[in-house]
């Protein structure tokens, strides 16, 4: 566990909800798939962590590190590579503050799929637009979800339910662009009625709808993972459809692999000399995992999309 190695897992675990059972079904079909943590002989199949809590824990850890300096809120305005280092210009969000010029041996971009940093680095991406959106929110359910996760496929998309604290459930509702626009503009009661209709009564009657947000869905894959002095990790390297819920885990593996590659050269006191070697090794180790998971995720999306036509 990477968070255990960082010494922050216990804080994250306190605010997380374990998933012990996963139930996958398709509307209108009799069969379903069921996975249990006991059968798999693991403590949990996964954990649901509130993004805000995860961010707070990690931010607190960063603030306590004397060798880490944060510039926030700033964004990268320009980037240039030289033979021995790179130059990064930071632009403040606050107009009263001045630009900051940084010189570094390496830039690690963990900026997400849509940050625009790819263009500054000169890295192109392949993008597949699924013409779908994900609406994310939370509800109360009459039947407690009790550490179970559900994924329900139907003719136009899918609905996933994940356990939260206090008998609340998070949902991720994937649906076509034109339908998502309609659903975002409905009243809470109308939204709950449609959500209930597509998911069914497995968790009983739904109520007390929280805030909902919408994200467009696509597959984004960088055509290369690094330049001479910059490297991509997480969604900056691959932005996946949430159908398999593997995007965050893929990003964690990127960070763990890059850390190992860097650490190996640091202990040999050859980091500055071997940056090219580090980045080539990182790409060689990560590309097979990226390729396998992007093809798998894209295949699932296309499989269920073909069933809807």
Question: Over which residues does each language-model region extend?
Answer:
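C-terminal helical "tail/cap" subdomain of flavin- and related membrane-associated enzymes
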Residues: 260-309
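FAD/FMN-dependent oxidoreductases across multiple families
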Residues: 182-275
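Short glycine/proline- and charge-enriched loop/turn segments
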Residues: 35-42, 175, 297-300
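Glycine-rich FAD cofactor-binding loop and adjacent beta-loop-alpha segment at the N-terminus
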Residues: 1-19
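Conserved N-terminal helical subregion
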Residues: 15-120, 128-133
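Pyridoxal 5′-phosphate
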Residues: 83-84, 145, 251
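A general structural signal for well-ordered alpha-helical segments in protein cores
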Residues: 51-55, 132, 136, 191-192, ...
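Conserved FAD-binding catalytic core of PHBH/FMO-like flavoproteins
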Residues: 3, 93, 99-101, 106-205, ...
